[in-house]
Design a protein with these regions (language model features):
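Iron-sulfur-associated redox domains of electron-transfer enzymes in respiratory
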Residues: 137-506
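Iron-sulfur cluster-binding cysteine motifs and their immediate structural context
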Residues: 8, 21, 25-37, 69, ...
Length: 506
């Protein structure tokens, strides 16, 4: 398998041979604009040549605009009210990379003249592909630090799985290296009162999602069941495919569940006034900022990995020099299955592990835990899993352009369970991750994914249903998955937002 890079926009394609009629999905350049990359890790010259050509063209446009005011505005529209991302106008060179990414990679299309307002999933892929750093997450880290400094609130952080294998990149560590112990130490140094693992929330999601799936399977509910932990995908479904909303799992995302449990259960156990609690989710994902504002009221702040890197440097905390600390108890650690939520296919693997236990009353053996067909970076992955008298067909989709392939001609209907992630590689490729050379993105995603699988392999507890703290939560408070208490705190509903495409008011 060879890698080719587009000299105009930096898009990378992996194929045995580039066909003569190949067209770049980003900038629509032909085959002649691609060059073969001979080294595994792209060198600086590769990146410089791409950026130089993009910048040179953009500067020519800027210069011509002084004379001609009718020059095309190539950048993607970002509303001033966008909760996830913002543009720094002074850095923008109108190269069009953001718009190409949004249209060709994220697969968003709409008529702005009709819509009146831009439609954004908040995924932040434009951030990763901007050559000048003109688009950034909407920062909240200064607000969080200000709250901590008042000493009036109980501030609680949760570390998402994908963050622990990326944070070291800004501190001289290798992509994929597990920094979770050092992150706990760093967050306590900053002043957080409690630090939890979002993998606990992922385990909770698994318990509820598997119970929901089993109920649909036995009661002939709407099938297939789609996952709902990626907020960018959820919004895409609401806007572009409202016909699928009955098929979406009603489960909140892991941080949505965990924040609800913190304010309802943890507060009582620790005798803390819920109004005094401030929850801060540390995520690889800018779209989680949108989720916090539009979908889940219990998430107070979402701080991306890239933001946390800035905060640590401002506080002169060198992550690579810190000792490891443990998560706080009660809602602390998660299983290995919860950790691999950060990879494309990880949710499905975790679901299979627990569904197998429910349907057969036995755990999968250690050598049965890895589902190779569901791993890797193919746009659509599928497998058939046999349990008792069922042959369950599952599919894993990364990037929404691939989802459209699955939806064509009702092809998706042959599956029982479909996982969808907006970003390539899943959460490890999120728009809030530390920046790197555009041409090295794929290599770094692979290293991060490997890091999460390594953590899972080393965990003593690898099944969500074997998480002891989770068992206590159900015993003492929730009773069982899909209980009245669970539905109240852990489940949600969706609404048809296709009116946005028509420029209509709700």
């Amino acid at each position: 398998m060879a890698k080719y890079i587009c000299a105009k926009c930096g898009y990378i394609v992996e194929t045995d041979k580039l066909s003569d009629d190949y067209v770049c999905p980003m900038c629509e350049s032909g085959n002649d604009e691609f060059k073969l990359v001979t080294n595994d890790i792209f060198d600086q010259d590769d990146l410089d040549s791409v950026i130089d050509s993009v910048v040179e063209e953009a500067l020519e446009i800027k210069t011509s605009k002084i004379v001609n005011d009718t020059v095309e505005d190539k950048k993607v529209r970002i509303s001033q009210y966008n909760p996830a991302i913002v543009r720094i106008p002074e850095k923008c060179i109108n190269c069009g990379q953001c718009k190409k990414t949004c249209e060709k990679v994220v697969n968003l299309s709409y008529d702005l003249n009709v819509c009146k307002n831009p439609i954004c999933l908040g995924c932040g892929q434009c951030i990763l592909n901007c050559p000048t750093g003109a688009i950034v997450p909407r920062y909240c880290y200064k607000d969080v630090k200000g709250i901590i400094n008042t000493n009036e609130k109980v501030v609680i952080a949760m570390i998402a799985p994908a963050v622990r294998v990326s944070m070291g990149e800004n501190f001289g560590m290798d992509p994929g290296e597990n920094t979770e112990g050092k992150l706990v130490t760093a967050l306590k140094k900053i002043g957080f009162d409690y630090v939890f693992d979002t993998a606990f929330g992922a385990d909770l999601t698994i318990m509820e999602e598997v119970a929901e799936f089993a109920a649909r399977l036995t009661n002939k509910g709407p099938m297939p069941q789609f996952t709902s932990c990626c907020p960018a995908w959820v919004k895409y479904a609401e806007v572009y495919h409202p016909e699928l909303l009955d098929n979406l799992s009603t489960c909140k995302s892991p941080i949505g569940m965990q924040c609800a449990i913190i304010k309802e259960y943890f507060s009582k156990e620790k005798n803390i006034d819920p109004s005094k609690i401030v929850t801060v989710a540390i995520t690889p994902c800018t779209s989680k900022k949108m989720e916090a504002r539009e979908y889940t009221i219990n998430i107070d702040y979402v701080m991306t990995a890239s933001e946390l890197s800035i905060l640590l440097k401002e506080e002169d905390i060198k992550l690579n020099n810190l000792n490891d600390s443990e998560y706080d108890k009660l809602l602390g650690e998660g299983s290995g299955g919860g950790v691999i939520f950060g990879n494309s296919g990880g949710v499905t693997e975790s679901v299979i592990r627990t569904l197998y236990r429910i349907m057969t009353r036995t755990n999968l053996k250690k050598d049965q835990l890895v589902f190779t067909d569901l791993r890797g970076f193919n746009g659509i992955k599928e497998a058939t899993i046999e349990m008792n008298n069922y042959k369950l067909k599952v599919a894993v989709v990364q990037q929404l352009e691939n989802l459209e392939e699955l939806l064509k001609d009702g092809r998706y209907k042959k599956y029982h369970f479909i996982e969808v992630m907006n970003c390539k590689g899943g959460c490890i490729g999120g728009g809030g991750q530390p920046l790197c050379q555009i041409t090295q993105l794929d290599k770094i995603r692979e290293q991060r994914a490997k890091g999460l699988y390594n953590i899972d392999n080393k965990r003593t507890v690898r099944f969500a249903h074997d998480n002891q703290e989770l068992k206590l939560l159900y015993k003492n408070y929730l009773r069982k998955p899909l209980s009245e208490e669970s539905f109240k705190l852990l489940h949600t509903s969706y609404s048809d937002k296709s009116y946005l495409l028509r420029g209509e008011e709700k």
